[in-house]
Amino acid sequence: MRNTFTLALIAFSFFAYAQKKTIDSLTMDYTADKGILTTYFKPEKGKLLLALNDSVLEKPLLMVTRYVKLPANYSAYRNAGSKTAEGVISFELKEGKLLLRQLSYVNLAEDADPIAQSVVQNNLPPILGVFEKMNSEEGFHLVDVSDFFSKDSPGFNAVGETEKKNYKIGSLDSKRSFIDRVKSFPRNTEITHTLTYPAAAAPRSNRSETLSFQLNHSIIALPEKPMKSRTVDHRVGWFSLEQYNYSSEALKSDNYRIASRWKLEPKDKEAYARGELVEPIQPIVFYLDPATPMKWRPYFKKGIEDWKGPFEKAGFKNAIVAKDPPTKEEDPDFSPEDVRYSVVRYVASTTRNATGPSVKDPRSGEIIESDVIWYHNHLRSYRNRYLLETGAANEKARTLNTPEEEIGEMMRRVIAHEVGHALGLPHNMKASSAYPVDSLRSGSFTQKMGIAATIMDYARYNYIAQPGDENIRFVRQMGPYDDYAIEWGYRYFESDAAEKKWLKDFVDTHSLNPIYQFGSGGNDPNAQTENIGDDPIKATAYGLSNLKIVAENLEEWTTQDGQTFDDLQELYMELIGVYRRYIYHVVALIGGVNETRIVKGQEAIPYYNVSVQKQREALASLDQNLWKTQKWLLEPELISRFENEGHLDLIANLQKAALYRILN
């Protein structure tokens, strides 16, 4: 009993002694870095301490987690720069401890409304971490967060559930996990750490049965005053965040969506009000990844700055700027993982894709930062489809050694598309049906208007233009819908009433014009992917006519003496895919329902069936181009160049799938 009492007394005395020690004495052998969260780091011991000022407590902080490095062949869509988690956190002082909570801004109510109390009670923020307070002095509270950032703590999402199952990933190995580096700035703190896991079925080429990940956490202060939000109009496409207002008079919680937008305000508001072009206080800046090959950088920059024109429609000049990555001398703190920098990432990956995700303030929809991601092998996708879809009418496409300026032009437009996502715009699959089919055979029309009304559709190439058509634009470009959508999202207003009226009038006067319509798919045959033109039957007829020419010349255009037929086989398989897309554009007419997004008072029918006559024409087209054996796809001289015993099944399965879709 006496020993127990003695031990307790010693422990209490030690605790009391520790509390008497100053923060300086407790951190004297640590590397200090002052910022929004003052950090004390001792890498040789794996120790990280945070000193939080009272001014930070219970303030919303945005925490974004990204991969810095990850294992080879881990996932097609998880790469360096990919976001694994994003959320708002806050630190709360409670009984000598600091709690780390995750906040939500989905369910809301006016502060003065009694129901606000119920909203709070029924939306308790989860606790992600609890830290014993080491000391407090002069408004600072010192805590040890070493374990939190050395383990797989809640909210990191380092390992995806699918990958965890597929690779049989076990629990974190703490002996092989550690904090790498820490950096703090006035508005953000960056913490990088390595996490290691055993994996009984690791990805191919990994025989160690071990997976290590390096992640970066950006903790950034959100604006003291949230940006004024803009409620979405369903007739204009915008990425958005859903919120529920329990102070609504609608006899239920009023759910609505707020648009995801960058905060753009004019430097000279009086000049802006006069209709003059004005620079924003803070432009949108995208840096190129240091890993971007030099020869592609000019095209990436052009793709980013293609959006300058649409922003001018909204009254802003130089609203978006592309920059090379700064040197260490220019900006020693630059890091693509730092949430202060928006970067177009160039990823060494076999994935054929590109993406444009962004980080948002959930209170207002303000876009804080975005990282556009370009996957290296996406180059091959565009080269192949350029040949297959335009080669019949476009001499420059009839080779696998596509001219650099042609590849660069395609990359430019892909970057512009992904930057559009980063600005808040989703895909608009309706826009590719805005133009009359035969206008896409006109050089003057396509050079001025492009091949679709927006860069945000999956309308990549002009497959309608025929051999002999002159001065044709074959690659997509910015369109009138892009001007329209950006003006809706970014035009600045001082008055809420003026904003509401102007936006409604603006959409009311534009939204029934096909070039300004928005649609996202479903059963609407005019909102399909990879199509162009207002008549799927006619467009497909032109496309198939061209594809037959390409098939006849495929070997000549893809192989040279002394080479294998691997490229020929790859292009043949992709040619079948192009054929399938053209056919399915017609299939969509059968049982299709045209959609026009309207509001009460507009003279249009929101939903109407495709006419019987048009559906019969579609069946006749399928009878000619699908049900009858397409011998041009099965030429023995072509097929015999490579072993493909399943080529007959490819066509048969396509026929079956189309029939199943029609009947169901």
Q: PLM features: residue spans?
A:
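Auxiliary tRNA-acceptor-end handling modules of aminoacyl-tRNA synthetases
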Residues: 19-292, 310, 314, 325-382, ...
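Conserved catalytic/binding loops enriched for acidic/polar residues
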Residues: 432-664
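Sec-exported extracytoplasmic/periplasmic mature domains
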Residues: 305-316, 420-421, 425, 461, ...
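Soluble non-cytosolic domains of exported or imported proteins
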Residues: 55, 82, 253, 290, ...
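Extended catalytic-interface subdomain
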Residues: 355, 360, 366-374, 412-423, ...
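Zn2+-dependent metallopeptidase catalytic core
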Residues: 57, 295-319
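Bacterial Sec-dependent N-terminal signal peptides
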Residues: 1-20
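The catalytic-center signature of Zn2+-dependent metalloproteases
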Residues: 324-347, 409-465
